[in-house]
Amino acid sequence: MRFVSIYILTLLVICCAANSNAQAIKKGISKKPASSVKPAVNKKPALAIAPIKIAGTRIKITTDSGVIVVLLYDKTPLHRDNFTKLVNNHFYDSLLFHRVIAGFMIQGGDPESKNAASDQHLGKGDVGYTIPAEFDSTLFHKKGALAAARTNNAQKASSGCQFYIVQGKKYTEEALSAIEQQRGLYFSPAKRKSYALVGGTPLLDMNYTVFGEVEVGLEVIDRIAQAQKNNFDRPIADIRMKLETLN
């Protein structure tokens, strides 16, 4: 009996030890493997990169065909300041785009167009002064270029008020090379790419002062250029403008 008691006691000790070890092991084991626990990630929204705004004076041109916004170049200060002055004095309000030629340009700024009869030939009105030419080889007649109209004069001085915006067309490398020879010009690789892919009127480069460019509203130029017109290239339905400075 003593042997049995010792045997039972021994079994009890072994069982208790085993149970104690099992509980210790159970406490040390996590319900999920450590490798499955993912660290918390603080997801922040990607920062939007704002477009860089080029410094300069901007003019809003509201027309019957839509809105155009042009940037005036600081490289042509005489034209920039004169144009801004006329805009701020409301000179252009209610004037017409009196001459439009698809694949070339749209022209306006004739003061005689404000109250012109429907059959009146326009384009000779002015403000009584001209502006000295401000040519810069980096400013060219790409599509959307804003340039000053002028009469035929040796100094190539600009009209004090009439302007045009280029619609133009696309040119091949061969055509650009021919213009270079004809006009004695040089078209840089960047200009060639612009004239080939975007279009413009390269024949006018260094002949008429370019003093700005369209930032918004190229499609408006296309619409105006396609307007029905009479034999003087004047739109049959009046296309009026209102100009204001934006900055």
Stretches with model-predicted labels:
Residues S20-N247:
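Cyclophilin-like peptidyl-prolyl cis-trans isomerases
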Residues M1-I25:
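Bacterial Sec-dependent N-terminal signal peptides
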